Design a protein with these regions (language model features):
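Metal-dependent catalytic core segments for phosphate chemistry
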Residues: 286, 295-315
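Phosphate/NTP-binding elements of NTP-utilizing enzymes
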Residues: 1-293
Length: 315
């Protein structure tokens, strides 16, 4: 370990996980949820936990990972593979047993990892309907950023009927998002779903050794090497777009949607999903076409866009 400037250090400096990560991984409640700061290692720690569960001899069902888009889910699976490689190396050296399945060919793809006991970890599309018909533990990563969190929860929950747990991981995305409604229900309305609720702000993470871990991972010439926890906290805060975004992204305080001229739900309905076709060839247009131009005179880009008028609406 380096001689770093961080003052808050974990009790066991060589431990892989910080206390809040370990507490999350040790929680075997049927439904657990964490409202968290950005980039404090929850998805990474959860990927190790999935592998540790999947390679057990008594594992019964597969594990399903859904994130806000397919790319993010595959990145989660890449972390799973790194941990699985570590388990494979250690266990094989100790007992000669393979962790991965031994069927010839690669035991993993971009979408799944297969283990010796027939259990697999799968990455999934963000489409909530993909949750149907699948049994076992599911991780709903970046939950509030999914296209439809309410639908995702509704279809994912029945999948743990025969065993496993549902782990919901997210930063907030507005006070009216279903993620925040789950948090408020658990805190203030009797917790009817019996959710095991975790909350870790940036301040909480720093108190438990986050900066110590970060500085040991950063290059020696990174300017954050000269910071203590107070310096780092203030640096992050000062670089956020505004106070409200800092509170939401790092302090688990959702933005008040009532202050938005257009609500996040309305804006999200206007987004094209990843992989969704959005361009129409000009020769296939049947309505009148309108062109708009916004000229960037100094540092901004010039933008040109074409819209088609159908039934009185421009698309």
């Amino acid at each position: 370990m380096r001689n770093v400037k961080a003052k808050c250090r974990p009790k066991d400096e060589k431990a892989v996980f910080l206390p809040y990560q370990q507490k999350w991984c040790d929680d075997r409640s049927r439904i657990k949820l964490v409202e968290k700061s950005r980039q404090i290692g929850f998805s990474w720690a959860t990927s190790n936990d999935l592998v540790a569960q999947a390679i057990r001899t008594d594992a019964k069902y597969d594990f399903w990972v859904s994130s806000r888009d397919e790319i993010q889910a595959r990145l989660f699976l890449q972390d799973c593979k790194k941990f699985a490689d570590g388990y494979e190396k250690f266990i094989k050296a100790q007992s000669g047993v393979n962790v991965y399945t031994d069927e010839g060919g690669k035991p993993y793809t971009s979408f799944d990892i297969k283990f010796y006991n027939g259990i697999a970890i799968h990455s999934m599309t963000s489409n909530a309907d993909a949750q149907a018909g699948k049994r076992g533990t599911r991780v709903l990563d970046e939950f509030a950023l999914h296209p439809d969190p309410l639908k995702l929860y509704s279809i994912a929950y029945p999948g743990i009927t025969w065993g496993g747990q549902m782990a919901i991981i997210s930063t907030h995305r507005g006070s009216q998002n279903f993620f925040n409604k789950l948090c408020e229900e658990a805190k203030f309305n009797g917790n009817p779903k019996k959710i095991s609720l975790h909350k870790v702000t940036l301040e909480n993470a720093l108190d438990q050794g986050f900066l110590f871990k970060l500085q040991n991972a950063l290059p020696a010439n990174d300017p954050r090497q000269d910071m203590d926890e107070t310096d780092y906290f203030n640096d992050v805060k000062s670089k956020c777009a505004d106070r409200e975004s800092f509170l939401q992204e790092y302090m688990c305080e959702p933005m008040d949607d009532a202050s938005w001229f257009l609500s996040p739900d309305i804006l999200e309905d206007c987004f094209y999903r990843y992989g969704e076709a959005w361009q129409t060839p000009i020769d296939e247009c049947t309505g009148s076409l309108y062109i708009g131009v916004d000229i960037g005179r100094t540092h901004d880009l010039t933008v040109i866009w074409v819209l088609e008028k159908l039934s009185g609406i421009l698309f």
